[in-house]
């Protein structure tokens, strides 16, 4: 009888321990207004920013300071997303799909292979898609805050213009521009980790010139979400951010600049080619939205459909991508492109340049035949710039970049002070 009493006591204790463990698998660690943050949210983020965390590196999970930093970032994210809900700010899914297509191209994956890869690292595609949506949403909100709150004085701009080097506006570059995006208010360890990877790529490039292959070889589960590789056409020195000026003075073809840290991430720039092209001042700067169907040169019916889209847009003031959703059953419209481009009028190909010259602000062209197929073109903005205005514009953007951290810090402090935030131990 005594044996059974002891057995029942032990069984009860074991059961309570197991049930207690089950109850504490997840828990609420913070309240942010009407939202909650779970312990599992923090652990998932730690997993996504550490290497081989499941291979015996469990002490990271116990690092209180690291845990606290991730919690702080999630609190900031919650505050920002609550603003997007209140103001009904959304992201165009066309941009997001284009970004994911760039990732597929970078890693040389089909869509199915990409889904399988995400599954192997503990993510499903829907969760990944939502994470990228949130990232783009945060960036858009922060950009709005920057432009609303940035107060840059004329004397500040004058100081930068006086200090800056004289640029050769006739010098143009073909660039491979690699951007490693950073979270809002990144921790020093996040910056160090990405900067280390950027330096590794530059070092390995001495032995392998294929940068995309190097990224695929040396990146891991975290990097896939934060690298963008953009290969430019000819771009004038005046259109390259001022943070690169000191390097562009003496740069040669094949040289690599970076890593350089700015408000929108860490940058590496590879100089693929250099040329000189006479630019006549003043410069006509154009911002335009160009929309069309890939490989549509031979398909005459697309011209009629693009004309119909133009007419519908002008009548209903509907965006390009919304019109395309209505035509998604047509196989031709499975591969549409939409890009907002800002560059000199002279840098557009002749057919686009001719169309832009005839448009008024926000007016949409008739279908234009280009080297890439048929396109609709919408003029967003046009401005005439002399050399001094070009230098002032570059200085303004440079100061905007420098003030980013301070403006974001003050704004987030205001959000915190106006919100109910409770940390639950």
From Swiss-Prot:
Its EC number is 5.2.1.8. Residues 1-20 form the signal peptide. Keywords: Chaperone, Isomerase, Periplasm, Repeat, Rotamase, Signal. GO terms for molecular function: peptide binding; peptidyl-prolyl cis-trans isomerase activity; unfolded protein binding. One of its GO terms (biological process) is protein folding. GO terms for cellular component: outer membrane-bounded periplasmic space. The keyword Chaperone applies. It is an enzyme of class 5 (isomerase). It catalyses: [protein]-peptidylproline (omega=180) = [protein]-peptidylproline (omega=0). InterPro entries: OMP_Chaperone_SurA, PPIase_dom_sf, PPIase_PpiC, PPIase_SurA, SurA_N, Trigger_fact/SurA_dom_sf. It comes from the Bacteria. Residues 170-273, 271-381 form the PpiC domain. Its main location: periplasm. It is found in: Periplasm. Chaperone involved in the correct folding and assembly of outer membrane proteins. Recognizes specific patterns of aromatic residues and the orientation of their side chains, which are found more frequently in integral outer membrane proteins. May act in both early periplasmic and late outer membrane-associated steps of protein maturation. The PPIase activity resides only in the second parvulin domain. The N-terminal region and the C-terminal tail are necessary and sufficient for the chaperone activity of SurA. The PPIase activity is dispensable for SurA to function as a chaperone. The N-terminal region and the C-terminal tail are also required for porin recognition. This is Chaperone SurA.
